[in-house]
């Protein structure tokens, strides 16, 4: 039996962490939000905040031991995972598990697990630890290729390379965009896919697994731009995706929501990546489902029932991006963005802006995917990120 409230310590306080915090507080929980800088989005609504380098094992261990939370919920990839493993051995609950956090923070570890251990279909790939190794690794894959740091987020350091001459620049971009200390990249074949999807997969305490309706999405440079739900898959494609998601999440273990990404190429479903936490493409569930991905994550984490997941006929999201470097920000055009029925705007509360930084998201629902995608696009286009304070 679950007794509330619980104390939750959140590692990472971005826009996804903010929604986790809000969902947790609606269940009466006490939330401690951690990040590398003060005033991060989740800190603005949390009960307590801590600023620290979460890659520093000693600092991370000290904070967790000081607060003694019931649950530690990672919201980002760049963490001192060895410290989490030690704390888990001491009895601290890490969501979904310390091992899952460690495996998924590096593209090489999750790709090896999927491709070699679980025999899931993935793009053809290789690894390289230098620009010279990258040249040798890329040639057999054919052109173009995609080069990514083994550790990064939101598309940082990713390049599509059309010929050997572009590989050195791709290596430099990958190293500049890499997180952590691994001077290594994954290079993979460029897939001419029909669709990218995220399958939100929820593991519960009793061992059962639930799936949300698949979410289609588009990226630029590996960074999410828009998403829609439900994505149109054949019965066989959905069956394949659910089977693969079940296989890999069962291997990782623990409880909570996982964002499992796939490419659809003809009749093939190809595994791409996995996040052991709510996914940015899943922001659409804030308007599309009776229980958002954040509420589903918390229910699984807190061992609460999920009787049913209801989905709207059609829903979509479109990110709101900054264009300039701004030390203080305001938003213009909110009234126009909210003038259409079944439209919502989320402004994340980030303290500053830079070109192409994700500052918010527009959400829309309705009866057809074409209509709601257009509606979300219009709402997002109405918002301007400008210098100043407040909302006008």
Curated annotation (Swiss-Prot):
EC main group: ligase
PANTHER family: FORMATE-DEPENDENT PHOSPHORIBOSYLGLYCINAMIDE FORMYLTRANSFERASE
InterPro entries: ATP-grasp, ATP-grasp_carboxylate-amine, ATP_grasp_subdomain_1, PreATP-grasp_dom_sf, PurT, PurT/PurK_preATP-grasp, PurT_C, Rudment_hybrid_motif
Cross-referenced PROSITE patterns: ATP_GRASP
GO CC aspect terms: cytosol
EC number(s) stated in the UniProt entry for this protein: 6.3.1.21
Keywords: ATP-binding, Ligase, Magnesium, Metal-binding, Nucleotide-binding, Purine biosynthesis
Description of how the protein assembles with itself and partners: Homodimer.
Binding residues for N(1)-(5-phospho-beta-D-ribosyl)glycinamide: 15-16, 75, 280, 350, 357-358
Chain residues that bind ATP: 107, 148, 153-158, 188-191, 196
Gene name as annotated: purT
GO biological process: 'de novo' IMP biosynthetic process
Protein's organism: Prochlorococcus marinus (strain MIT 9303)
Function: Involved in the de novo purine biosynthesis. Catalyzes the transfer of formate to 5-phospho-ribosyl-glycinamide (GAR), producing 5-phospho-ribosyl-N-formylglycinamide (FGAR). Formate is provided by PurU via hydrolysis of 10-formyl-tetrahydrofolate.
Positions of the ATP-grasp domain: 112-302
Pathway info: Purine metabolism; IMP biosynthesis via de novo pathway; N(2)-formyl-N(1)-(5-phospho-D-ribosyl)glycinamide from N(1)-(5-phospho-D-ribosyl)glycinamide (formate route): step 1/1
Pfam families from the UniProt entry: ATP-grasp, PurT_C, RS_preATP-grasp-like
Catalytic activity annotation: N(1)-(5-phospho-beta-D-ribosyl)glycinamide + formate + ATP = N(2)-formyl-N(1)-(5-phospho-beta-D-ribosyl)glycinamide + ADP + phosphate + H(+)
Gene Ontology molecular functions: ATP binding; magnesium ion binding; phosphoribosylglycinamide formyltransferase 2 activity; phosphoribosylglycinamide formyltransferase activity
Domain of life: Bacteria
Family: Belongs to the PurK/PurT family.
UniProt keyword annotation of Magnesium present: yes
Entry binding sites for Mg(2+): 261, 273
Protein name, entry field: Formate-dependent phosphoribosylglycinamide formyltransferase
